[in-house]
Amino acid sequence: MKQLMMIGFGAMASEVYAHLPQDLELKWIVVPERSVESVKQKVDRHIQVISDINQCDGAPDYVIEVAGQAAVKEHAKNVLAHGWNIGLISVGTLADSEFFTELQQTAEQNGAHLHLLAGAIAGIDGIAAAKEGGLEKVTYKGCKSPNSWRGSYAEQLIDLDQVHTVTMFYRGTAREAAQKFPANANVAATIALAGVGMDNTIVELTVDPDTTQNKHTIVAEGRFGQMTIEMVGVPLASNPKTSTLAALSVIRACRNSVEAIQI
């Protein structure tokens, strides 16, 4: 049976843990030192809960990150240096161009692969394919409820308690969006890296006081033609800032790591 390492154990990780493929064994969970004991109480005894990659006593077949940008900065390079493949959900971390280059070089030098998971959006395969044939323009539009934007940079741009209609409060590049909205803009970073890049992808962020769902729209143009992809998703009940589909994309990546036929 193949073995999995999971970095993080918050709301999304708990969802993934509950729905892992039967033929993939979760062997290691990596969390901050302060959280080790509490996480141990939530998982099976055979799972090793550690705070440092170097404490791992084996070699995972696959590593997934579901912990946020700080955890990517702390652990991803070390994972790749061990020659282990890793799937990232916190793709916004790669808005840091120097860090992106470090990870790319480390992966190449150690024969490892860095997988950027689609997360909360559909159509990443189409964007990546269009890039091969002349993708020229990509705009990402994200719309969420006021509660989904609370605790983010949005509160510095708009009074979320005084929003009475659909309101766009941010327009900029994917690089800037990923840096300013680390918990909300991983989708923008994924779209950008699949397509025309961090500095050429336009991001528009909107708040809707009458919704409880997350709406993602991609509009792309190029020599291939035009495409519009719209996704209306439901947040996790345990965390309104996290898309259910994002958690499911991690589960799908785990399944792909063990299946002979991958989609």
Curated annotation (Swiss-Prot):
Its EC number is 1.4.1.21. Pfam families: Asp_DH_C, NAD_binding_3. One of its GO terms (molecular function) is NAD binding. NAD(+) binds at residues 120, 186. Signal peptide: none annotated. It comes from the Bacteria. Keywords: NAD, NADP, Oxidoreductase, Pyridine nucleotide biosynthesis. Pathway: Cofactor biosynthesis; NAD(+) biosynthesis; iminoaspartate from L-aspartate (dehydrogenase route): step 1/1. The active site is at 216. GO terms for biological process: NAD biosynthetic process. It catalyses: L-aspartate + NADP(+) + H2O = oxaloacetate + NH4(+) + NADPH + H(+); L-aspartate + NAD(+) + H2O = oxaloacetate + NH4(+) + NADH + H(+). Gene3D superfamilies: Dihydrodipicolinate Reductase, domain 2, NAD(P)-binding Rossmann-like Domain. InterPro entries: Asp/hSer_DH_NAD-bd, Asp_DH, Asp_DH_prok, L-Asp_DH, NAD(P)-bd_dom_sf. This is L-aspartate dehydrogenase. It comes from Acinetobacter baylyi (strain ATCC 33305 / BD413 / ADP1). The gene is nadX.
